[in-house]
Amino acid sequence: MSIFEDTAPRAVRHEPLRVAVLGASGSVGMQTLDVCRHFPQKVQVVALAVRSSAEFAVKAANEFNCKYVAFADASVKGNVLLDALPQDCKASFGPEAVQALAVLDEVDCVVNAVVGEAGIYAGLAAVKAGKVLAYANKESIVVGGDLLMPLVKPGQLIPVDSEHSAIFQCLIGENPADIQRIWLTCSGGPFFGYSREQLKHVSADDALAHPTWKMGAKITIDCATLMNKGLELIEAHHLFDTPMDKLEVLVHRQSRIHSMVEFVDGSVKAQLGASDMRLPIQFALSYPHRWPAIAKPVEWQETAPLTGDYADEKTFGCLALARHAGTVGGTLPCIMNAANEVANHAFRRGRCSFLDIEHIVAETMNASEVQRVEDLQQLTLVDAEARALARSFVG
């Protein structure tokens, strides 16, 4: 099912919009709070969740006068810093506490910025509870798309990834049957134009130097391998109910075109703007309306010529692996995602090389049995088995 089964935007919304920000201390979470900071009359941060940062949570809870704070790491309980939470703010602990925020009666919209597979549970809980889900947790769709998407009602799920937000905006008012191709753009990462021989020698510090976007470490490495773009292909496949062979990747070094949709009549709609994650976050919170810009607008007369190149799936094999996983479907995307998280982490810790990431993921995929997706418990088991297998390939 596509999120564009019905293109009519939701007409009724609570104002101020009552928001729960999950993964609030991460890159997307902090930028979400910054958007909320600029629109205090339109957005109320009711709840926030972090992994373990008591200092950050206390500061944010006081700034936004939050009623609820959750810590995924239960060991934070008893931290003396929590004494400084607002008097009427309730703190809770453990993974279940994060999920509980997604179903609060006082919450209209859940911003799911939790990194990794853990965000699936909160995303499913939010959708089942009828909340609007502004999601930046691509793993929710890549791993659990077969479970999540049949539950999503039109207008309920708004993508926060810049590429999928762009596609979403291009498709408003359009008939999904008229889509010829969807083009997801990417900067090419820090190693655009490198050969396989050159990639043998790059370090984690090299890979973390993204040319355009300010993001967390895990996703920045994924951008360097182009696995991030591969995950986004699978996302688009689920979100817009589009076959994998109608999804293309365009390397666009200027990062001004965030994605494009080509229609059967040959026309193309593109969404352009500044390279600022606050733009898609703001759109997700304001939809179906638009709020005044807080990001610096693009000075088009000063912009370099806009260029595009096909992505090199032979040099950057993770992109080809993701396309294969999305085409096969079933539990293979879950297996791929789990192996990638293990390999990504190992690379950042100096335990494997850059090209080893691709090899670890490929070996794990090849050694795993692909099943039809049945339920979340099955995916949890598949994820755990794939991680254990991937760790064995790290050595």
What role is predicted for each listed range?
Residues M1-G395:
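Catalytic, metal-anchored helix/loop core of enzyme active sites in primary metabolism
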